[in-house]
């Protein structure tokens, strides 16, 4: 398996084993994209709900309590099929704490299977859709492959862009340039 970017090692541990099993089942059933969509929906709920994060991370809840609570949430959210069964199985096996990593590992496996390279892009403020497409096109030219962008807004960059793709990183942020100038000025004294 590819060790692509910072998510590569996820495919080696518990998260990777669960994600690989889910991916293989989804592939065999022709449901890879449906499962990804449902996992993304659950991941969005997870990021938005402090109560769900507490349920997932806390060892104080029994497997039965976690399974029941997650089952009710999945029903309300309309998450069903293989993804729902996978999430419930994770709860029943006391592996719910690893679910965020399992979801990331599943995404990585899907990208790998489709030949898509992941790029983490940090900018100071949200760019327009046209700028995002220009960034994607530039990264596609470099990677010689389709690129999936994870966009992060980081006002501390002041301006510019930081791109991490695989083991390569380009920092063209204004913050880094100002720090370089500051360092050069200190050395010139």
From Swiss-Prot:
Membrane topology of this protein: Peripheral membrane protein
Keywords assigned by UniProt, alphabetized: ATP synthesis, Cell inner membrane, Cell membrane, CF(1), Hydrogen ion transport, Ion transport, Membrane, Transport
Keyword Magnesium: no
InterPro entries: ATP_synth_OSCP/delta_N_sf (IPR026015), ATPase_OSCP/d_CS (IPR020781), ATPase_OSCP/dsu (IPR000711)
Pfam families tied to this protein: OSCP
Database matches in PROSITE patterns: ATPASE_DELTA (PS00389)
GO terms of molecular function: proton-transporting ATP synthase activity, rotational mechanism
Superkingdom as given in the UniProt entry: Bacteria
Cellular compartments per GO CC: plasma membrane; proton-transporting ATP synthase complex
Stated family: Belongs to the ATPase delta chain family.
Function: F(1)F(0) ATP synthase produces ATP from ADP in the presence of a proton or sodium gradient. F-type ATPases consist of two structural domains, F(1) containing the extramembraneous catalytic core and F(0) containing the membrane proton channel, linked together by a central stalk and a peripheral stalk. During catalysis, ATP synthesis in the catalytic domain of F(1) is coupled via a rotary mechanism of the central stalk subunits to proton translocation.
Subunit description: F-type ATPases have 2 components, F(1) - the catalytic core - and F(0) - the membrane proton channel. F(1) has five subunits: alpha(3), beta(3), gamma(1), delta(1), epsilon(1). F(0) has three main subunits: a(1), b(2) and c(10-14). The alpha and beta chains form an alternating ring which encloses part of the gamma chain. F(1) is attached to F(0) by a central stalk formed by the gamma and epsilon chains, while a peripheral stalk is formed by the delta and b chains.
Protein name: ATP synthase subunit delta
């Amino acid at each position: 398996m590819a060790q692509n970017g910072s998510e590569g090692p996820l495919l080696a541990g518990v998260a990777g084993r669960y994600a690989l099993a889910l991916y293989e089942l989804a592939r065999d059933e022709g449901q890879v994209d449906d499962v990804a969509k449902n996992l993304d929906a659950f991941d969005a709920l997870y990021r938005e709900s402090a109560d769900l994060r507490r349920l997932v991370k806390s060892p104080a809840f029994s497997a039965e309590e976690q399974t029941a609570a997650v089952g009710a949430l999945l029903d309300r959210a309309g998450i069903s099929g293989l993804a729902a069964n996978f999430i419930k199985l994770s709860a029943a096996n006391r592996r719910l704490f690893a679910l965020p990593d399992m979801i990331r590992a599943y995404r990585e496996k899907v990208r790998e299977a489709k030949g898509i390279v992941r790029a983490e892009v940090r900018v100071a403020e949200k760019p327009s859709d046209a700028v995002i497409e220009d960034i994607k096109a530039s990264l596609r030219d470099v990677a010689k492959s389709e690129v999936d962008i994870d966009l992060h807004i980081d006002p501390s960059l002041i301006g510019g862009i930081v791109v991490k793709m695989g083991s390569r990183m380009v920092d063209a942020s204004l913050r880094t340039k100002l720090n370089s100038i500051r360092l050069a000025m200190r050395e010139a004294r």
